[in-house]
């Protein structure tokens, strides 16, 4: 320590020299710039313009002064370089001193003593600034439960990833819903240097369920109290965040504050920015005990190792039991209990500067915390009103939040150069598959799309459905893009059963969809519709990937494989459930065909029965689907027979057959090599046939295709010759793969293709 401080004195002496040399020089020059008490300009031209006494000798003197000034400046620059080298060699007892250093404004915890010690020159740390190593992993814990909170977490994570320069390890205390959503999201996001671990929140309920809580977060709002018990025993420190947090700076700056903790300080918190704990918000307002204004727990720095040694579990439980005898319940969930503990043990807390948790609650005084934008580091939307909270600067905060809400998450897949990362099997396999492709191949983009991993957010809106107990339930499966959004309400009116939809959207479009859905009474009244967002990437519409995502996340034993442009007949849901029993789909390989028709009219009086449909067919109001452009697609359905059929009938597979079918949920997936327009359904029906599915046409079922503008992909198919060539190549490769997988049984498809 003596050597450290001796080096410090040398450093201070050198610094004083750096300051004194230019100061003395400028005093000399300044005094020499006066003649007879009047200022004399050092500029020869200015002097000549204003002084009649300008002479050649005085010009030489001033030129010599200017030369001397330049020499002094060169000496100063050299001295600065020496000082910077000396500072770089200065010994330090802090870890990671070779890495990036974050200098921060002090919090109030022991800050006066620290400043006094530095001024006195006898600080034990010699004024060393806190540091975070370049590749040090930052640990973040978040409690998340339910569908809405899962959406909020994504925005929080985006804001953290946008600014971060360090590896991150997220510890998510999640219920089964949030775990399913977020596990899929992070797995498909594939962000380098990010690790995610999940902890079952449902198993922790018994730890806090005995505490009555009036806060809107419910029982999950108390789970931060048990983090010392939940998180790994070898984890020493963690940043704990609420889901309604937005970062405006690098989280490493906050992580660096841990180095400022002293003595028994184990909690880093920002003071509450409302008068809640002062008890003067309304008459007879009785808050939980708190130190002054109390502290907000939206952002917490936890020293887990010290908390465990202090027996934190016992400490907060005893405090909660004692206070609940008088308070009966908590109003602000875990925050009330944290504050009650701090009231009794103020030495536990290190008060963070208020910009680490700028609170936008209903009664906030947070505007006193910041002066300009540069002061903001963390924004906390801690009001039930969220973005609708009243604040004179709320428009600025809202725009900052919306920036990350709509930010393209694919752009956050950037590498942290210079930091070794754990090998990710999925990422390595993807790179291997891509490296095997020939980039000079004219169909390279088509082939690449098959291996593209699209970021996926399951159950974007609240979903709640229990399949019927009789095991006949059927889910309608479809996929769509933003331009087909208007079909959702109509489909929901025609189909009362469960629906699974995969939506291909950008981040910004996902928010537009959210606003659209929340503004629709029809959609908000339905909780049995699963909306799964597959985020845009690449130039093709991944139609079969979308179908697979929607198929994979159904909870019923059967599914109706439809398309978003079709309206099913009224009552089709119940009719299909009866047909499942009638045709014994549970024990046989059958694909029930729903005959497809179309109209060219945007306003259609939808037929209520088969008789009405046949009448409209005869009048030319309806047509069999694609009869005029792609007859082969649905011709095997045998519409002539269907007109008079009263019982289900079997049809045989033919080339290019692509009906809409009802099958068991264990049927084969769609082949991902087919993207955009062409052969995506044909290939699937071919695979059903080779697996010996029977195609059964339902006599009293129908669906009608509604008119719409041509899609971008069909336009490319029609106008781009290379597109059609690549599609043909993919078809041939698919048929070859079928022959390899199914052998002799697949030969008929090659023959049928040659004859068609």
UniProtKB/Swiss-Prot annotation:
Coiled coil spans: 53-95
pH dependence: Optimum pH is 5 for xylosyltransferase activity. Optimum pH is from 5.5 to 8.0 for Beta-1,3-glucuronyltransferase activity.
EC annotation from Swiss-Prot or TrEMBL: 2.4.-.-, 2.4.2.-, 2.4.1.-
Reaction(s) the record says it catalyses: 3-O-[beta-D-GlcA-(1->3)-beta-D-Xyl-(1->4)-Rib-ol-P-Rib-ol-P-3-beta-D-GalNAc-(1->3)-beta-D-GlcNAc-(1->4)-(O-6-P-alpha-D-Man)]-Thr-[protein] + UDP-alpha-D-xylose = 3-O-[alpha-D-Xyl-(1->3)-beta-D-GlcA-(1->4)-beta-D-Xyl-(1->4)-Rib-ol-P-Rib-ol-P-3-beta-D-GalNAc-(1->3)-beta-D-GlcNAc-(1->4)-(O-6-P-alpha-D-Man)]-Thr-[protein] + UDP + H(+); 3-O-{(1->[3)-alpha-D-Xyl-(1->3)-beta-D-GlcA-(1->](n)-4)-beta-D-Xyl-(1->4)-Rib-ol-P-Rib-ol-P-3-beta-D-GalNAc-(1->3)-beta-D-GlcNAc-(1->4)-O-6-P-alpha-D-Man}-L-Thr-[protein] + UDP-alpha-D-glucuronate = 3-O-{beta-D-GlcA-(1->[3)-alpha-D-Xyl-(1->3)-beta-D-GlcA-(1->](n)-4)-beta-D-Xyl-(1->4)-Rib-ol-P-Rib-ol-P-3-beta-D-GalNAc-(1->3)-beta-D-GlcNAc-(1->4)-O-6-P-alpha-D-Man}-L-Thr-[protein] + UDP + H(+); 3-O-{beta-D-GlcA-(1->[3)-alpha-D-Xyl-(1->3)-beta-D-GlcA-(1->](n)-4)-beta-D-Xyl-(1->4)-Rib-ol-P-Rib-ol-P-3-beta-D-GalNAc-(1->3)-beta-D-GlcNAc-(1->4)-O-6-P-alpha-D-Man}-L-Thr-[protein] + UDP-alpha-D-xylose = 3-O-{(1->[3)-alpha-D-Xyl-(1->3)-beta-D-GlcA-(1->](n+1)-4)-beta-D-Xyl-(1->4)-Rib-ol-P-Rib-ol-P-3-beta-D-GalNAc-(1->3)-beta-D-GlcNAc-(1->4)-O-6-P-alpha-D-Man}-L-Thr-[protein] + UDP + H(+)
Subcellular location: Golgi apparatus membrane
Compositionally biased spans, kind Polar residues: 44-58
One Pfam family named in its UniProt record: Glyco_transf_8
Superkingdom, taxonomy of origin: Eukaryota
Cytoplasmic side of membrane: 1-10
Tissues of expression: Ubiquitous. Highest expression in heart, brain and skeletal muscle.
The record's free-text note on cofactor binding: Binds 2 Mn(2+) ions per subunit. The xylosyltransferase part binds one Mn(2+) and the beta-1,3-glucuronyltransferase part binds one Mn(2+).
Region span, Glucuronyltransferase activity: 414-756
Assembly with partners or alone: Interacts with DAG1 (via the N-terminal domain of alpha-DAG1); the interaction increases binding of DAG1 to laminin. Interacts with B4GAT1.
Protein name: Xylosyl- and glucuronyltransferase LARGE1
Gene designation: LARGE1
